[in-house]
Amino acid sequence: MDRVTLTEAYLEELESAGLSSEELLGNLPQNKILNSDKPNGMGKWLARPVFLGGEELTRLAGDLDNLLTALDSLPEKLFGGDFAAFARAVGLTGPQVEAVMQNRGERMTRQSRADLVCDGAGFKLLELNIGSAIGGVDNVDVCRELLEVPVLAGFAERHGLTFVDSLREQVHNILTESGFCAQDAPVVALTEWPSAFSDELPYMTQLCERWGELGLDATPCHLGQLEVREGRVWLDGRAVDIIVRTFLIRDVVGPDAARLTAPVFEAARRGEVKVFTPLDTSAYASKAALALLSEEGNRHLFASGVLESLDRILPWTRRVRREEVTLENGERVDLVEYATAHADDLVLKPTSLSGGKGVVLGWADDLTPEAWRAHVLAALDSPYVVQRRVRPVQETVPVPGGGVDRFRPVWGIITGVNGFIGGSVRAIPSAAGDVVVNVANGAHVGALLHEAPAPVV
């Protein structure tokens, strides 16, 4: 079966069961870790999961693996191994490049969350979040809570639907990419920036407790609580083996930031501690890096199988510059003129912001042609990309008060050392209109259940 047939079959069962959306959620609204970082301790949840068939999952996982491999190769293939040049090309500022060069890994991490939409023909990538600070890894709890409801549990059993324990896989990512195994019992410091620590502490505490259940000895802290002395990094009198970084590139370029970062990054370079994940993820996660993969002039760098994956999963994406670019049909056009004339089919995105910040939808009802042109011209002076619009198919979901509603989803597919390691979905009611799908605009969070991946032939 596939996404569509599984969804149709489950909606038929729900209609016969006659359960309310509240009953379908079970105890999900009371889950501690899932709601610890939500406003008022309560999130908005979809009353049913989304589904993927085995063949769909196999192809999607393969496409993401090819994309990540291609992304990892860009500094070498395009810049001769000059990582600073790569970082500048994808829009990092001078101070950001300097910070990244102080804390790099031997290779790009495989821990990522790909935010995708399905347009009916397949999945298209909107952005790629890379590194230790990605959200959505706690999706395993959403799956477990929903599967406590008998109607979904029975449906999942009959159709062979399952999920991946993303938290367990995250622990595996941390250990493997830091050079440890579980038997080493490394001491982990889950480390935030001081100014954000108090707000994030409830969630960090819950996460460390869950990691502890999986055998990982982790403690929440902020960077100012770490001490570098005697050839080690210390937290509360314990030598730390791994720093799991949740602070961001924007934090480390602020005033007086070097006082906090320099001792720790120097200790990492000396091999006294591992950082999961290093700051180089900020360059790989830039949307301009996706533009480099999309640009016609770089296609010769990749094998045919990789190109097939990129063509399937990556919408037409270009850095906003005064230059000629190639369209999907091979036509050469002036980028600024083309973008200005095709607002309804394009979106502007800052290269390094997340959560929909700074995104301009060319088709927005309240955006005039003059305003769109002004946004395009302004983007020439900042690191921006322009991307082809993707028109997603909507999902039917039971809602409070009875009946169903249509939701516009963004799928968050998580990858790690073992490839696909789970996923979730954020979805916004269609009545909200064409707005960015995020919590600020009323997005609900849902689970992903899937068939076992089909064998690769």
Regions found by a protein language model. Give the residues of each.
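Preference for protein termini
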Residues: 1-457
